[in-house]
């Protein structure tokens, strides 16, 4: 029960996004616990028979992962011709994940390995992160010259890591977060 005793969920604001722009179900907005869980446990071994680890895994799925999916879906819904994709990778190869990510891309770009990402990150930039990116690993279909060109354009248009630090979360709600993410997406 460590996870539920340590964190005070009474301060979590529940907000219904009901503007014409972002019709939504009832969903808590991100809070510091959604970021802290990755800072505290990201990269650590997950023991499937350990009750504490099971609770942490459930928390990650129910809160930061669900909120990331909601964020991405709302952004994709706001951009004609875009869709989102998210794998529920709250743990990888027996270790807690370092982040929650969802991809948003034009339907026609699905197999081009170029996309926007939104989510919680604890590794490079701690907080909520949104950016234009591309598949950088060996599985990428992009040739090296295209990867270099993508990097150049991302820097040139300031589409790299945009971070909202945990200390700034009180300045945001779903509408504001979705709007700034959509604005970034529309610059491409």
Residue locations for each model-derived region?
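Charge-rich, low-complexity N-terminal segments
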Residues: 2-113
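Residues that form generic nucleotide/phosphate-binding pockets
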Residues: 74, 78, 153, 180
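Conserved, charge-rich beta-strand/loop surface module that forms ligand/interface-binding patches
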Residues: 99-103, 107-109, 115, 144-149, ...
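Residue-level detector of short, conserved catalytic/binding motifs and their immediate flanks
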Residues: 114-116, 128
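Short beta-strand micro-motifs enriched in acidic
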Residues: 119-123
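Compact, glycine/acidic-enriched structural inserts
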Residues: 124-173
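Long, compositionally biased interface segments
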Residues: 173-188
């Amino acid at each position: 029960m460590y996870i539920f005793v340590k964190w005070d969920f009474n301060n979590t604001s529940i907000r219904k996004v009901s503007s014409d722009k972002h019709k939504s179900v009832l969903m808590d907005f991100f809070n510091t616990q959604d970021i802290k869980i990755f800072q505290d446990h990201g990269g650590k071994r997950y023991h499937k028979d350990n009750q504490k680890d099971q609770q942490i895994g459930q928390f990650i799925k129910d809160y930061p992962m669900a909120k990331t999916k909601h964020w991405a879906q709302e952004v994709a819904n706001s951009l004609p011709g875009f869709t989102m994709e998210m794998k529920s990778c709250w743990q990888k190869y027996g270790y807690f994940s370092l982040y929650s990510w969802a991809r948003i891309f034009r339907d026609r770009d699905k197999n081009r390995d170029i996309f926007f990402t939104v989510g919680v990150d604890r590794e490079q930039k701690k907080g909520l992160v949104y950016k234009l990116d591309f598949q950088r690993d060996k599985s990428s279909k992009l040739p090296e010259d295209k990867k270099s060109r993508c990097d150049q354009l991302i820097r040139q248009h300031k589409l790299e890591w945009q971070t909202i630090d945990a200390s700034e979360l009180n300045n945001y709600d779903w509408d504001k977060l979705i709007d700034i993410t959509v604005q970034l997406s529309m610059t491409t």
